[in-house]
UniProtKB/Swiss-Prot annotation:
PTM-bearing positions, type Phosphoserine: 93
Gene Ontology biological process terms, A to Z: tRNA (guanine-N7)-methylation
Function: Required for the formation of N(7)-methylguanine at position 46 (m7G46) in tRNA, a modification required to maintain stability of tRNAs; its absence resulting in tRNA decay. In the complex, it is required to stabilize and induce conformational changes of the catalytic subunit.
Name of this chain's protein: tRNA (guanine-N(7)-)-methyltransferase non-catalytic subunit TRM82
Chain residue ranges for the region called Disordered: 55-91
Principal place of residence: nucleus
Cellular compartment(s): Nucleus
WD repeats: 1-47, 48-99, 100-147, 148-192, 193-237, 238-279, 308-354
Length: 444
């Protein structure tokens, strides 16, 4: 049975008039017009052929290896002293049995003037720069593609709207001027680094105008470095016992972090003090399922060891609330940040959904989630939910009318697209955060 591939992420413009959605290797654009009317505003697909690139690279390596083989033939002899010709290259061609290749699009960000959209493509480990033109039939136009040697994992945009900070899979951080001309071969040196995979990065400024880069990694570390003098480490934030998957910044001093621990951490990043922790383990327990059982080789005799991790934590822009979700669960948890007790966190609300949450984003005082709705029966729905703060009720509520109309817009926009309408077994892996957890084998 074919279904529309679930949405992997959402990003909304400041005024809410534009929404960008990721499905596989595509970015869909929608215009939002009140009340609850959506208009399809174009699609961009990453047509970079990673398989063909792999074949081309292999062919070049084989050609070079064949030349080396010819030179080495003089040195190779049989037991009888006869020359042996070796014409086969050492480098194998990709073929049957090779692992599947997934061309994810990640890390959607808008510049502050919203004239450009920045994203990352797994297909060629690149940073994508789009022009955003709301008057055009297709609002996105790819302008530049900066390729890296390692996959970009997280990005942050500087205030000048031209500098993008990129954290990669192998622990290096780079600074790119998106007005520059992309290099044919990546030669840039990193501005700072970790010894582990980077998971998040934020470029922030203190009240005195000094800039800092905050980075988190798989090794439980949060590092604060001066910018642009990134060789100067301001401080480390210690407290996590497992990987840090996501960080977010509040106003002034506040930093929030989460990951493989069963706690949310609140920090004063200026002083390095851990202000508070919020243990959510009892709250999430009813939402855990078989997907949270530890891998068989790390299980006990009763097969009841569970492992869970926060996939994303994000703060409301104007309100004292922060939301997060645990990977492969059907809820988001909203916490209130105390204004009296500095950095103190308290439960505000838990919002449940019919399917697992895939992504969480924020637009002003609205939270947005995308859902793993591949098991939806009948007409496919519940692609995303828009969650608004109701001042009168002092609580967050799902705007069902807006969400339902968005479902209809998604269905209409992908009709006839054989890439986005796919078999269930061909859906991209949607739960990758748990793979960051280290077990005994990583320390041996």
């Amino acid at each position: 049975m074919s279904v529309i591939h679930p949405l992997q992420n959402l990003l909304t413009s400041r005024d809410g008039s534009l929404v960008f959605a990721i499905i596989k290797n595509c970015i869909l654009s929608f215009k939002y017009q009140s009340p609850n009317h959506w208009e399809f505003a174009g699609k961009w697909s990453d047509d970079f052929d990673k398989i063909q690139e792999s074949r081309n690279t292999t062919a070049k390596e084989q050609q070079g290896q064949s030349s080396e083989n010819e030179n080495e033939n003089k040195k190779l002899k049989s037991n009888k002293g006869d020359s042996i010709k070796r014409t086969a290259a050492k480098v194998p061609s990709p073929g049957i049995g090779a692992p599947p290749i997934y061309s994810y699009i990640r890390n959607l960000r808008l510049t502050s003037d919203e004239s450009r959209l920045i994203a990352c493509a797994d297909s060629d480990k690149s940073l994508l720069v789009f022009d955003v033109d709301k008057t055009s039939k297709n609002v996105l136009k790819l302008r530049k593609r900066f390729c890296f040697s390692k996959r970009p994992n997280a990005i942050s945009i500087a205030e000048d709207d031209t500098t993008v900070i990129i954290a990669d899979k192998f622990g290096d951080v780079y600074s790119i001027d998106i007005n520059s001309i992309p290099e044919e071969k990546f030669t840039q040196e990193p501005i700072l680094g970790h010894v582990s995979m980077l998971t998040d990065v934020h470029l922030i400024k203190d009240s005195d105008g000094h800039q800092f880069i905050i980075t988190s990694d798989r090794d439980e570390h949060i590092k604060i470095s001066h910018y642009p003098q990134c060789f100067i480490v301001d401080k480390w934030l210690f407290g996590h016992k497992h990987f840090v998957s996501s960080i977010c910044c509040g106003k002034d001093y506040l930093l929030l972090s989460a990951g493989g621990d069963d706690k949310i951490f609140a920090w004063d990043w200026k002083t390095g003090k851990n202000l508070s922790t919020f243990d959510y383990s009892s709250l999430i327990k009813p939402y855990l399922n078989d997907q949270h059982l530890a891998p068989p080789r790390f299980q006990n005799e009763n097969n009841d060891i569970i492992e869970f991790a926060v996939s994303k934590i994000i703060k409301s822009k104007n309100l004292p609330f922060v939301a997060f979700f645990v990977e492969a669960t059907k809820c988001i948890i909203i916490l209130e940040i105390s204004e009296k007790q500095k950095g103190d966190l308290a439960l505000k609300q838990i919002i449940s959904f019919p399917y697992n949450v895939i992504s969480l984003s924020a637009h002003n005082d609205e939270f947005q989630v995308t859902l793993d709705n591949k098991e939806s029966s009948g007409v496919q729905k519940n692609f995303a939910k828009f969650i608004e703060y109701n001042l009168n009720e002092n609580s967050f509520v799902v705007n069902n009318e807006k969400s339902n109309e968005f479902d209809s817009a998604i269905i209409q926009s992908v009709q006839g697209d054989s890439n986005l309408v796919t078999k269930k077994e061909e859906i991209y892996p949607l739960y990758n955060v748990s793979s960051l957890r280290k077990h005994g084998e990583h320390y041996s």
